């Protein structure tokens, strides 16, 4: 028996996505910039895919830019706003691609305000309102935290920006929110939104960037006039079609999948909180049902991870993008966890493919692991 509970790192491509990618490699292999029939066939296929992905977030297809990943998109948005004397607002618990880009912006003369969170990763909206200034040009806040599942109040953040009279643009990293929470960029006032296909059972190496109509970003990759002049390079046609297929599959079932994920997370939550000493970093309420972060202060997370891996249970000690780093989680540190709680943390993350049997097996294996490792 195996239990894959590391879906926040990546997801298994669905059968329909695999079939779409494989068939398109042989059937729609043209360059979308070519004017002959082979190129036009590829361009038509990408145009249809663009419309499908746009509809999944309430956007127009002309507002979708394809790239290689959400990390690329995050870099592009932030670096496009860098100006000497500008002011950005972000949170202290962002993904490394945002965090490092903000550090780069600071070295380039931008002042960055990093909002603190409470013990469970929640923002203080009053602190956010007080941080807005006349020269604030960009606010960057993730929709769902990739380590804890904490959900940021994007609608309230947008309202606060508008009520203040600020001209700041709102960027949202929606990697852990796409196809997991309902997204309507129009209603939420989002100006830029980033996501990756491989987090929603699509292929790796393809991402999307929503750019609100009328806005423009600097290109990180210079060359041709691809993607409305905002991202040069020949398009990954098969990857894009696979991405669209994953959106087509998941979009009608967001609420159903959400409710099922909640029940699975509840089983994990109730089972693990029976273990003496376990600290829960992701409450059942007000967090994504797809992510559960816990801490076992009496052991090290990587020891538990390796033990579970031997048993066929796949979990992580935090962000996949930081798994090779020796530094403690900046997210859990910002939330005020102790060193033992941080070093003993593990993340369990679900998907619509997660089965009841996987949850039952993972719970059994984890309880066995805690009992065994506590004696070591």
Enumerate the predicted regions with their spans:
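Pyridoxal 5′-phosphate
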Residues: 1-376
């Amino acid at each position: 028996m195996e239990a894959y509970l590391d879906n926040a790192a990546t997801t298994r491509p669905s059968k329909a996505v695999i079939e779409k990618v494989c068939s398109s490699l042989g059937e729609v292999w043209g360059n979308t910039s070519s004017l002959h029939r082979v190129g036009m066939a590829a361009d038509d296929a990408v145009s249809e895919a663009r419309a499908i992905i746009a509809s999944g977030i309430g956007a127009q297809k002309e507002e979708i830019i394809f790239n290689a990943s959400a990390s690329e998109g995050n870099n592009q948005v932030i670096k496009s706003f860098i100006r000497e004397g500008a002011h950005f607002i972000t949170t202290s618990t962002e993904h490394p691609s945002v965090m490092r880009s903000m550090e780069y912006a600071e070295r380039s003369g931008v002042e960055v305000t990093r909002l603190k969170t409470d013990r469970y990763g929640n923002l203080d909206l009053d602190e956010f309102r007080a941080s807005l200034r006349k020269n604030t040009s960009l606010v960057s806040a993730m929709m769902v935290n990739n380590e804890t599942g904490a959900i940021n109040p994007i609608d309230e953040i947008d309202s606060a920006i508008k009520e203040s009279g600020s001209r700041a643009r709102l960027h949202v990293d929606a990697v852990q929110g796409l196809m997991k929470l309902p997204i309507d960029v129009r209603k939420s006032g989002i100006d830029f939104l980033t996501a990756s296909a491989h987090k929603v059972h699509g292929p790796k190496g393809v991402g999307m960037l929503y750019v609100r109509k009328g806005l423009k970003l600097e290109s990180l990759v210079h060359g041709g006039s691809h993607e409305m002049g905002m991202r040069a390079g020949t398009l990954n046609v098969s990857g894009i079609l696979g991405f669209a297929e994953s959106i087509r599959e998941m979009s009608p079932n967001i609420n159903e999948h959400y409710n099922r994920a909640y029940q699975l997370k509840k089983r994990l939550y109730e089972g693990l909180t029976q273990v003496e000493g376990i600290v829960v970093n992701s409450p059942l309420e007000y967090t994504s049902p797809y992510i559960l972060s816990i801490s076992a202060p009496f052991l090290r997370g990587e020891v538990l991870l390796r033990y579970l891996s031997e048993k066929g249970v796949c979990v992580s000690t935090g962000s996949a993008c930081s798994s090779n780093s020796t530094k403690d989680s900046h997210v859990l540190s910002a939330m005020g966890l102790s060193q033992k709680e941080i070093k003993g943390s593990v993340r369990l993350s679900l998907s619509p493919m997660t089965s009841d049997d996987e949850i039952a097996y993972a719970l059994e294996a984890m309880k066995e692991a805690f009992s065994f490792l506590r004696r070591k």
